[in-house]
Amino acid sequence: MILIIFSVFFITSCMTKDEKSVSATIDFWTFPNFTSESGKAGDFEQSLIDAFRKENPSIKINFKLLSFADGGKEIQDAIDKGNPPDIIYDAPGRILLWANSGLLEPLDDVLATEKPYITVGLLAVSAGKDRRTYMYPIHCGPFSMAFNKEMLEDLGLIDLLPYTRRDRQWTLGEYEKLLSALRSKLPSEKTPGVFFYKTQGGDQGTRAFLVNLYGNARLLNGDYSQYVFNTPNAVKNLDWTVKAMKTGLLFDGKDMTSNDAIQMFVESNAAHTILYSPQLNKMYDGKRNYKGKDFTPIYMPFPNSSSAPVLEFLAGGACIFKTSNKHRTKATKKFLHFMATDEVWAQKVINATGGFPASSKVSVETKDPEILYNSVLQRFYGQYYNNINGFGDMRGYWNTALKNAASGKDIQSVLDVFVRDSNNSLKK
């Protein structure tokens, strides 16, 4: 009898030990989504790994920092070779393409106790066609415009920016008045702002810009089954933008990327940028310069003369690739759960992104009124379409449309072609 009891105890103890301890080596890849206190890229991720391994020494993590320039290709090459990383921190667009191709591990088990605390909209954009969750949503944040506060104050134009107005909504007329005043007061080597379109990069900024302005110009219909950006107001918005570039209200960014345009803002060569966010602001800490000092970016929604503004937004999180090695999968899920829910490190992850937490369990640690204002901007989130069929193709058609319109081609015809080609991409 004693022998039987001892045997049961021994077997149970071994099972418990096996459940708690996992021995595996996993690969963790991410784009530059996080900033570190040292200012060195990758230091934060390594600190996160070190903290996790302190509690889980039997799990080794190989870390790779991808670049936005060629990171997507590196991932695809790894997938093509049948050797993708175990976990990637990215956005829903790419992640759900992998999910719908059967490459990812469902994460509903990891999220089982956390879903009630996560913003419903973020769960929706983290699910695949089978309605299972393939991205663990961790942070989010709006994309908006930003203005150089100190520059506007020095020029005596700060009162033309309605940033003290409740929720800061404003019209195209107010925006145009400010741009005109900036054009007349700025020296010739500086510009009120840049409309960039050299490449596809940062095109969430140009799309958000162009669906606002006069307003009532959606990119897609309500059920995402058809592109509709060729309506009279869509034509008016693009026509206004082309004329603004010709008259100097905006700098013609045909030879400028989104990074170039943001750099002009950061260096105070442009009074405002049409693409900014708390995450981007954090990336440029120590680099903003106006008259030898840092300056205050004032965040603003896009002007809209018909309704509330419509904003693009970022959602970020992690996915896990399928593998036949159950120990690696278990170890990877353990690392993901630590990253998203640890009492100390979940908060640090959000702080390092410069964004807002997807979970109500995690707070925003800042007293900066401009960063806090971005929580107001969340109410203006528009459609999230980065995960629909043909999204990558649509981006190419969008860039072509901007170039054709700026070159003088008929805007209605340009947008008709954009809608036709983009609708065809939905069928792929």
What are these regions (language model features)?
Residues 6-8, 12-97, 112, 159, ...:
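Conserved N-terminal structural module of periplasmic/extracytoplasmic solute-binding proteins
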Residues 14, 297-300, 348-404:
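Long, aromatic- and glycine/proline-rich binding clefts that accommodate carbohydrate-like moieties
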Residues 60, 246-247, 287-355, 400, ...:
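Extracytoplasmic/periplasmic substrate-recognition and gating elements
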Residues 65-74, 168-174, 253-266:
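Short helix-initiation/N-cap motifs at beta->coil->alpha
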Residues 67, 90-144, 153, 173-174, ...:
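Hinge/lid segment of periplasmic solute-binding proteins
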Residues 108-119, 165-168, 193-199, 216-236, ...:
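Short, solvent-exposed loop/beta-turn-alpha elements that line the ligand-binding surface or hinge
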Residues 130-139, 143, 171-226, 270:
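Extracytoplasmic/periplasmic solute-binding protein
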Residues 176-183, 222-258:
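Glycine-centered hinge/linker elements that transmit conformational signals in sensory
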